[in-house]
């Protein structure tokens, strides 16, 4: 393994000839092409963890991606971010000991609730903003924020939300800009699709998209044709469709507009968004919008297909949904000058740690069951042009 800031990898990897002397492996949570995840109890403490077991033979030629992921995860200590607790190395395996989260995925919780309001959505987004603001202060850009990467810590009704999946994360360099076109198209910022250098502002755009979905249950951008989809995003063309947005506050819409601002220089930062009245004040409404939102989530995010199209890291319902190690061959997005997805394999090398740390990988809309946006009279609200 390479060095991080001059630090030898041997200094942060613990040697373990037999990992089972340290952990009792309870059950397999998931398997993939390159790794296995097990529910494990640390013998010395009795604590439960999700241990990701990666054969070294699967890492050959992919060391740099592993190092990038670990470099990111090792820096992060935040209550709303899934933590890397430890790293062990045996002669044949690398073991990543991750914080165990068992509360399930965001969409599942919303659908299962009988009551859901703007205030609930505001509370969720506030936690995301706090976590992403922390990342940005650390010089880390997530680059792939989406609902599927938001997990509940526990089954408790008041459980906090957790951000997972740092397979596309990047440490900002001195120039504070990046240029690799990657992420999930439905959530990616216009400047990324335009192949322009970009910064942490891309995460703020994604938070705006997430907020949009949390309030209506469907994505702001949709088209059967990928080029047209990308054109919508490039122009920041989205609407607050009636009747789905009729009962949503103007404050919520203003919050979204400021995050889904085409110009990254005008776009809200996490700090600015956290001060918006919809987050920091009392403008988020308490009206129950569960019926409409949950119906749209069921319609637009069908599990059987949707989950195949995203990187996700989750221990859900009996801690059995986590699957790791799916190949990225079908998921690495590269946006060409004509906004085609024809070269999906070219964006990120298959060595990207999503291959090892996340579940079925892919790109929104590619291989997923696409469903049309509601065909109704629109309110006339659009994003900045």
From Swiss-Prot:
Location of the Protein kinase domain: 23-279
Induction: Down-regulated upon cholesterol-rich diet.
Keyword Kinase in record: yes
Pfam families attached to this UniProt entry: Pkinase (PF00069)
Active site: 144
Cellular component GO terms held in the UniProt record: cytoplasm; nucleus
Subcellular location per the Swiss-Prot or TrEMBL entry: Cytoplasm; Nucleus
BP GO terms, sorted: inflammatory response; negative regulation of apoptotic process; nervous system development; positive regulation of apoptotic process; positive regulation of CREB transcription factor activity; positive regulation of neuron projection development; positive regulation of neutrophil chemotaxis; positive regulation of phagocytosis
Gene3D superfamilies assigned to the protein according to its UniProt record, in alphabetical order: Phosphorylase Kinase, domain 1 (3.30.200.20), Transferase(Phosphotransferase) domain 1 (1.10.510.10)
Molecular function terms from GO: ATP binding; calcium/calmodulin-dependent protein kinase activity; calmodulin binding; protein serine kinase activity
Main location: cytoplasm
Summary of the tissues where the protein is detected: Expressed ubiquitously with high levels in brain and low levels in kidney. Isoform 2 is highly expressed in brain compared to other tissues. In hematopoietic cell lines predominant expression was detected in T and EC cells.
Region listing for Disordered, in residue ranges: 363-385
UniProt KW keywords: Allosteric enzyme, ATP-binding, Calcium, Calmodulin-binding, Cytoplasm, Inflammatory response, Isopeptide bond, Kinase, Neurogenesis, Nucleotide-binding, Nucleus, Phosphoprotein, Serine/threonine-protein kinase, Transferase, Ubl conjugation
Catalyzed reaction equations: L-seryl-[protein] + ATP = O-phospho-L-seryl-[protein] + ADP + H(+); L-threonyl-[protein] + ATP = O-phospho-L-threonyl-[protein] + ADP + H(+)
Compositionally biased spans, kind Polar residues: 375-385
EC top class, as a word: transferase
Region entry Autoinhibitory domain, spans: 279-319
Cross-link (Glycyl lysine isopeptide (Lys-Gly) (interchain with G-Cter in SUMO2)): 113
Function summary: Calcium/calmodulin-dependent protein kinase that operates in the calcium-triggered CaMKK-CaMK1 signaling cascade and, upon calcium influx, activates CREB-dependent gene transcription, regulates calcium-mediated granulocyte function and respiratory burst and promotes basal dendritic growth of hippocampal neurons. In neutrophil cells, required for cytokine-induced proliferative responses and activation of the respiratory burst. Activates the transcription factor CREB1 in hippocampal neuron nuclei. May play a role in apoptosis of erythroleukemia cells.
Entry domain remark: The autoinhibitory domain overlaps with the calmodulin binding region and interacts in the inactive folded state with the catalytic domain as a pseudosubstrate.
Name the record gives this protein: Calcium/calmodulin-dependent protein kinase type 1D
Organism: Mus musculus
């Amino acid at each position: 393994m390479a060095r991080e800031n001059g630090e030898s990898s041997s200094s942060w990897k613990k040697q373990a000839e037999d990992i089972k002397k340290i952990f009792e492996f309870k059950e397999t949570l998931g398997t993939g092409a390159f790794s296995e995840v097990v529910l494990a109890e640390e013998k010395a403490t009795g604590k439960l963890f999700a241990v990701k077991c990666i054969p070294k033979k699967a890492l050959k030629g992919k060391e740099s991606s592993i190092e990038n992921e670990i470099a990111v995860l090792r820096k992060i200590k935040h209550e709303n971010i899934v933590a890397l607790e430890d790293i062990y190395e045996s002669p044949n395996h690398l073991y990543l000991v991750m914080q165990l989260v068992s509360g399930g995925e965001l969409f599942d919780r919303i659908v299962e609730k009988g009551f859901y309001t703007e205030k609930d959505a505001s509370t969720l987004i506030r936690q995301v903003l706090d976590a992403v603001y922390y990342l940005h202060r650390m010089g880390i850009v997530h680059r792939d924020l989406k609902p599927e990467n938001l997990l509940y810590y526990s089954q408790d009704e008041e459980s906090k939300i957790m951000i997972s999946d740092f397979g596309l994360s990047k440490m900002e360099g001195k120039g504070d800009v990046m240029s690799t076109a990657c992420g999930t198209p439905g959530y990616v910022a216009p400047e990324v699709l335009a192949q322009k250098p970009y910064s942490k502002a891309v995460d703020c755009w994604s938070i705006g998209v997430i907020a949009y979905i949390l309030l209506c249950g469907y994505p702001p951008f949709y088209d059967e044709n990928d080029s047209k989809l990308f054109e919508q995003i490039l122009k920041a063309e989205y609407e607050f469709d009636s009747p789905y947005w009729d009962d949503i506050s103007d404050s919520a819409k203003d919050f979204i507009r400021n995050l889904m601002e085409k110009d990254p220089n005008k776009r809200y930062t996490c700090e600015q968004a956290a001060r918006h009245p919809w987050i920091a004040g009392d403008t988020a409404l308490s009206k129950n919008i569960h019926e409409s939102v949950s119906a749209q989530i069921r319609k637009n995010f069908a599990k059987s297909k949707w989950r195949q199209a995203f990187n996700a890291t989750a221990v859900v319902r009996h801690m059995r949904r986590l699957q790791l190690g799916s190949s990225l061959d079908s998921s690495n997005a590269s946006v060409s000058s004509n906004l085609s997805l024809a070269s999906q394999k070219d964006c990120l090398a298959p060595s990207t740690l999503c291959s090892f740390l996340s579940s079925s990988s892919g790109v929104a809309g590619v291989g997923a069951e696409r469903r049309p946006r509601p065909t109704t009279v629109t309110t006339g609200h659009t994003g900045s042009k």
